[in-house]
């Protein structure tokens, strides 16, 4: 699986979208709490507004890196994907972030198995969980008591991915 950052404008077919969502819904979670909520956005205007608002927020960041992302006119936080899946987590569950990460990974792998491109996008939480972005919680119908954790940009690949970068060596040791 590789991150896709160039998408065709064609919308993901409904059956494929449902298969991706089902993979997320069936992800493992601590004590089977399933502390996630998925919000599917396919309205280009909302996706673009989220990106623009993220960039405006990023330009105010104390982090040089985040500020540079916000200042990049060509950057789109969702890489112009036609579908975005926002993944929010129940704030009362101590493992919500990790459980939601498992759901995201399942969705990414399912998408790839069907030839659909995807990219894990965490930046958007920087906006949604800020005072400037909290109105999105209501607009996107994120349930009360949940906060934005991860998101997935989803769509058909515009380009074939290049060869993957080398993996770090010595990432595994064995004790037998």
Show where each model-derived region lies.
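Acidic, surface-exposed loops and disordered segments
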Residues: 1-176
């Amino acid at each position: 699986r590789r991150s896709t950052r160039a998408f065709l404008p064609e919308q993901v077919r409904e059956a494929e979208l449902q298969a991706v969502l089902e993979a997320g819904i069936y992800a493992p979670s601590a004590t089977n709490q399933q502390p996630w909520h998925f919000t599917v956005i396919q309205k280009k205007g909302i996706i673009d507004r989220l990106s623009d608002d993220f960039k405006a927020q990023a330009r105010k960041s104390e982090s040089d890196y985040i500020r540079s992302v916000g200042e990049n006119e060509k950057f789109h936080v969702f890489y112009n994907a036609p579908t975005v899946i926002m993944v929010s987590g129940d704030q009362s569950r101590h493992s919500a972030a990790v459980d939601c990460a498992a759901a995201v990974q399942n969705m990414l792998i399912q998408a790839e198995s069907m030839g659909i491109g995807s990219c894990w996008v965490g930046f958007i939480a920087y906006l949604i969980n800020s005072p400037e972005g909290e109105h999105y919680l209501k607009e996107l119908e994120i349930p009360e008591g949940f906060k934005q954790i991860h998101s997935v940009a989803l769509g058909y690949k515009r380009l074939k991915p290049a060869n993957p970068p080398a993996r770090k060596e010595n990432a595994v040791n064995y004790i037998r």
